[in-house]
């Protein structure tokens, strides 16, 4: 007997093999073992893969489900007759009605390459046999749903177009008819509905929306003065010191009388402060008065006659001789 020698897998091949092996269902293997032995009457053995490797039991299985599917079953111990049995089984289950994506390849079983796919194929075959009416005591596989065709006449089809189910939706009732472009004005009434026009621009319906009432008419540039009253509304004007509780104003505050930055500031205002009655002591013969005028010597002489002699007294005689007293400069 010839055997294929296959070394261990490494790297990505080993990773893929381990991932496929992790999906293998041992409970499904036991159910398949019982189902195949019940249908064929043949024992698989302890090793599921080695018991099906020669393809003899598989050919007997499809012949039980569909008699005459495999006409010749090879019982040789050589590899090529065994591969031929597996190939005949694959062709037979395709003719039986199996989907191509549910069928395994010959190497998946013969070389133990992907026993998970072999298991998937046999479970699908059991479900297809159940669908065709082949029942056993082993409940395995899922029965395929049968096609149930319904035909309706034209009258029923047209009648259903006007019925909206509670669990269905429709887009026939809703449309964008009459919708205006974004940003344009919306009318408060529809001329087609023959409703009365609104009285003025300030009338807004409770169930409608409008942008007619709001505008930028009368809006001022940033920083300009705002009026407290509107002449169009025939309201009584108020003075500059009156500020409404619901309005704002900037008329009270101003820069009137403000001097240039860095200049001197007046301590008092002549309009509100009286002239001083007490004598003012000056530190010079001339100075600045309270009203901003200069004080002359005659004014100072009139205020202080005892101290003023017409001229300044010289404490030192004019013929005084200075001596160096031997100091060398």
Swiss-Prot record:
The keyword RNA-binding does not apply. Residues 280-329 are annotated as: Disordered. The modification N6-methyllysine is found at residue 158. GO terms for molecular function: actin filament binding; calmodulin binding; microtubule binding. Residues 306-318 have a biased composition (Basic and acidic residues). Transmembrane segments: none annotated. One of its GO terms (biological process) is actin filament organization. Keywords: Acetylation, Actin-binding, Calmodulin-binding, Methylation, Repeat. The keyword Plastid does not apply. Gene3D superfamilies: Calponin-like domain. Calponin-like repeats lie at residues 164-189, 204-229, 243-268. It comes from the Eukaryota. InterPro entries: Calponin-like, Calponin/LIMCH1, Calponin_repeat, CH_dom, CH_dom_sf, SM22_calponin. GO terms for cellular component: actin cytoskeleton. PROSITE patterns: CALPONIN_1 (PS01052), CALPONIN_2 (PS51122), CH (PS50021). Pfam families: Calponin, CH. Residues 26-130 form the Calponin-homology (CH) domain. The modification N6-acetyllysine is found at residue 23. Thin filament-associated protein that is implicated in the regulation and modulation of smooth muscle contraction. It is capable of binding to actin, calmodulin and tropomyosin. The interaction of calponin with actin inhibits the actomyosin Mg-ATPase activity. Belongs to the calponin family. This is Calponin-3.
